[in-house]
């Protein structure tokens, strides 16, 4: 048994010692069978939440009314969820109620896709009542039961299906794809925040080229923020090298450029992204326009952007052009390391020095003067020493006075 499961065996065994059933379930079991890196290990049990909390000394009630308790075991947190069935779904988003049951199969039956409805016992025996292993072998995403019913229960499952295409490289089964086309309008019931979470995972997957056209083909695009008029560009966006990007800001910047978004901020705000992400994606695209070619970075532009943003700019450019960015990254690192200063805080002078030298009250001119100083320093026009900067500034002022 793989280490992530071995580390959680103590929870399974404790539950079984007290007469309860307990199994590993969900994405960890799926990823084990696929051969992917295993993430969080989840456990399903016949024990009720209050029974779970009695059996373990350190638990966190994160949703006991829905059956979930976090058990902290040997320093690691595990979600332990009681077998349950879901009641009728409210607004195609969430069940109005849940009913705790004692049957593993009933619990697995409520899950979205067959590959996620597989369990494993403490000996490593696989329990697969809905054909999840066959779907994995055929590299297909199939729903548990009728696809139409699953998507009417929770419309976000349609977006999850396409996201799994991006993450796993699997295809949608014919029934799954057909049901998404039929039920795509139900996405109108889903919050933007939930859509954004799935979209970010989709854009980060290694098989984005297969997933993006599916958003267009299934009609999901029409219910995603800002995409209703972008169907052809969405298909074309599959041609870019998305897997070369490592940061969410880079992916959103590439999406904006791929979709020819003119006004970036409203588009990204519609996805309810954090301001920090919006600002950075916008700054990446602005720098991409200001520096037309990788070899055309000036010292001033490199300093203003900072190394991390400059590297992101070249990563996005590489993804757009299909040319590897590593050689340009190495050159940017070398050039940035050679800059006399890396931040404005490293300047040998500050605003107080400038005010004292000028002998006049503070005002907007102070920032303008400091900006002129750092530009002169990074372009090697003057050394970053207080005396030399003072002399340079006095000469600059004399020249300015003569010209006036």
Swiss-Prot record:
Keywords: ATP-binding, Magnesium, Metal-binding, Nucleotide-binding, Nucleotidyltransferase, RNA repair, RNA-binding, Transferase, tRNA processing. GO terms for molecular function: ATP binding; CCA tRNA nucleotidyltransferase activity; magnesium ion binding; tRNA binding. The keyword Nucleotidyltransferase applies. It comes from the Bacteria. It is an enzyme of class 2 (transferase). CTP binds at residues 27, 30, 111, 154, 157, 160, 163. Mg(2+) binds at residues 40, 42. Its cofactor is Mg(2+). Its EC number is 2.7.7.72. Pfam families: PolyA_pol, PolyA_pol_RNAbd, tRNA_NucTran2_2. ATP binds at residues 27, 30, 111, 154, 157, 160, 163. Disulfide bonds: none annotated. It catalyses: a tRNA precursor + 2 CTP + ATP = a tRNA with a 3' CCA end + 3 diphosphate; a tRNA with a 3' CCA end + 2 CTP + ATP = a tRNA with a 3' CCACCA end + 3 diphosphate. CDD domains: NT_ClassII-CCAase (cd05398). GO terms for biological process: RNA repair; tRNA 3'-terminal CCA addition. HAMAP family: CCA_bact_type3. A single active site specifically recognizes both ATP and CTP and is responsible for their addition. Homodimer. Belongs to the tRNA nucleotidyltransferase/poly(A) polymerase family. Bacterial CCA-adding enzyme type 3 subfamily. Catalyzes the addition and repair of the essential 3'-terminal CCA sequence in tRNAs without using a nucleic acid template. Adds these three nucleotides in the order of C, C, and A to the tRNA nucleotide-73, using CTP and ATP as substrates and producing inorganic pyrophosphate. tRNA 3'-terminal CCA addition is required both for tRNA processing and repair. Also involved in tRNA surveillance by mediating tandem CCA addition to generate a CCACCA at the 3' terminus of unstable tRNAs. While stable tRNAs receive only 3'-terminal CCA, unstable tRNAs are marked with CCACCA and rapidly degraded. This is CCA-adding enzyme. It comes from Geobacillus kaustophilus (strain HTA426). The gene is cca.
């Amino acid at each position: 048994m793989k280490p992530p499961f071995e580390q959680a065996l103590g929870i399974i065994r404790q539950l079984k010692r007290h007469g309860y059933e307990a199994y590993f379930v969900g994405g960890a079991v799926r990823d084990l069978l696929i051969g992917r890196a295993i993430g969080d290990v989840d456990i399903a049990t016949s024990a009720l939440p209050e029974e779970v909390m009695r059996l373990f000394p350190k638990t966190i009630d994160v949703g006991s009314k829905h059956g979930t308790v976090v058990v902290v075991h040997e320093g690691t947190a595990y979600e332990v969820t009681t077998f349950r069935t879901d009641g009728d779904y409210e607004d195609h988003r969430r069940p109005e109620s849940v009913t705790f049951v004692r049957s593993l199969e009933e619990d697995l039956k409520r899950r979205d896709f067959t590959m996620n409805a597989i369990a494993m016992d403490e000996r490593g025996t696989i329990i697969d009542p809905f054909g999840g292993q066959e779907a994995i072998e055929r590299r297909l995403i199939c729903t548990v039961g009728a696809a139409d019913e699953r998507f009417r229960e929770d419309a976000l499952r349609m977006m999850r299906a396409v996201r799994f295409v991006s993450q796993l490289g699997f295809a949608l089964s014919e029934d799954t794809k057909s049901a998404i086309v039929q039920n795509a309008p139900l996405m109108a019931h889903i919050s933007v925040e939930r859509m954004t979470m799935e979209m970010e995972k989709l854009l980060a997957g290694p098989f984005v080229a297969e997933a993006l056209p599916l958003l267009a083909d299934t009609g999901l695009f029409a219910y995603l923020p800002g995409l209703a008029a972008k169907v052809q560009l969405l298909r074309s966006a599959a041609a870019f090298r998305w897997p070369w990007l490592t940061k969410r800001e880079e992916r959103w910047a590439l999406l904006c450029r791929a979709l020819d978004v003119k006004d970036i901020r409203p588009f990204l705000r519609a996805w309810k992204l954090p301001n920090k992400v919006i600002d950075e994606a916008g700054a990446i695209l602005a720098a991409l326009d200001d520096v037309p070619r990788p070899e055309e970075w000036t010292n001033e532009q490199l300093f203003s952007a900072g190394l991390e943003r400059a590297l992101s700019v070249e990563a996005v450019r590489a993804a757009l052009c299909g040319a590897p960015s590593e050689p340009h990254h190495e050159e940017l690192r070398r050039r940035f390391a050679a800059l006399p200063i890396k931040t404005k805080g490293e300047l040998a002078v500050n605003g107080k020095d400038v005010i004292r030298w000028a002998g006049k009250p503070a005002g907007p001119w102070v920032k303008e003067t400091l900006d002129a100083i750092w530009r002169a320093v990074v372009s090697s026009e003057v050394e970053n020493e207080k005396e030399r900067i003072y002399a340079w500034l006095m000469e600059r002022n004399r020249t300015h006075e003569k010209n006036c």
